[in-house]
Amino acid sequence: MNKVDLIRYQIGMDWSKEIVEDASIEDLDREAIKRARELFSKRQSDRKKAQEVLKKLSDIEVLNKAGITIKGKITRTALLLLGKSESKYYFDGFIPRITWTLYNADNSIKAYEHFDIPMLLAVDKAYSKIRNEKYRYIAGQQTLFPDEVDQYEPELIKEIINNCIAHRDYVLRGKINGEEFEDRRVFIKEEAFIPEIFDQARDPGYKPPYYRNVFLCNAMVNLYM
């Protein structure tokens, strides 16, 4: 499948950059747009000045600047990150989705929940379902009062989910699965990562030969995803 990705890259194809005909800003979720404006403002080096400038701009102008829309036109990235739940039909039967599943000790399913677009809001909703117990420990011999830490760093879990969103092959129409067992948390996207051999990515200075969803990735960076 990576050969297909490479061909797409060589001819300049980017699924996430495609304009969605007939879609408009009315197909985007108001809460997601508001959150996108906040995050994009936070991303600016001069935050105070940026807030003053961005307040004067319309929603579509801010989305243009954030690299989510193109000249006011709605992209697949815009629908994926900010689209209303009822705008799923623009994906032609494919539902961009995160599914959280909680398993019992015998690996039977105890509970599950689906989180659909807008993905900007779905990440936090999915994270809120994941158990992240507090651990107490005493740091050194200078104190008898224990510190409390999360079992998992919240930002690390969100980064994993964001990476699954950014680097999926949406042409294959899969979904993201967050699977929670008693002793581990597993995140699965139904397509191969780039590179398919993980050891290559661990080599110092390694750069993949191509990227998926460059437009989407840049937009997510602008929104602190």
Regions found by a protein language model. Give the residues of each.
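Conserved N-terminal catalytic/coupling substructures associated with nucleotide/phosphate chemistry
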Residues: 1-154, 158-225
